[in-house]
Amino acid sequence: KKLQEGLKQVLRLKNYDNANGIKNFAAICLNQIPGKPESTKGNFARGVYWTKPDHFGNEVTRDKILDETLYTEFVKDFEHTYFKEVYSKLSSKFKLGRVRILLKEPRSTLSWHRDPEPRLHIPIITNPGCIMVIEKVAKHLPADGSVYITNNVKYHNAFNGGEENRVHLV
């Protein structure tokens, strides 16, 4: 409930960034490179990943390589939200990079891809049709307050086959 209330507070202040028009991608960055608010926008909201886009199966790099260790400043606009407390607690236990609220709209999916590092996922809003697939393992991550460590250096995707939004803190 607290995460969902925090999400409502954030959405009153900011809309999702679609990384300059990328279909099926939407994010709100909660932290930034100190003094650089532009590090939360456009391609910086997405970041580098690798994919095999066609039948040849050759891996290609997409988007900009980011040094996520530089993302150490919580965005001031969101300091009054519950996400600040969550961010502080998580950063005391884990070395965090970018922290984002990620939206996956109904009946949408990501590409089959891999990321440069593992991720923490905290589902905020989900439905039974939301599945994350890492290599050949498919799992539904319920919005029950749990923190899930996902090995996103392996090929994976996330899809929302339901009719409600899927929102994760990642």
Language-model region placement:
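Non-heme Fe(II)/2-oxoglutarate
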Residues: K1-V86
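A short glycine-rich, His/Asp/Glu-containing loop-to-beta-strand
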Residues: E85-P106
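Long, contiguous binding/interaction regions
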Residues: I101, P128, D144, V153, ...
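Short, conserved beta-strand element in jelly-roll/cupin
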Residues: L103, R114-C130
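A short hydrophobic beta-strand segment most commonly corresponding to one strand
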Residues: L120-P123, V147-I149, E163-V170
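A short beta-strand-loop-beta hairpin characteristic of the jelly-roll/cupin
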Residues: P123-A143
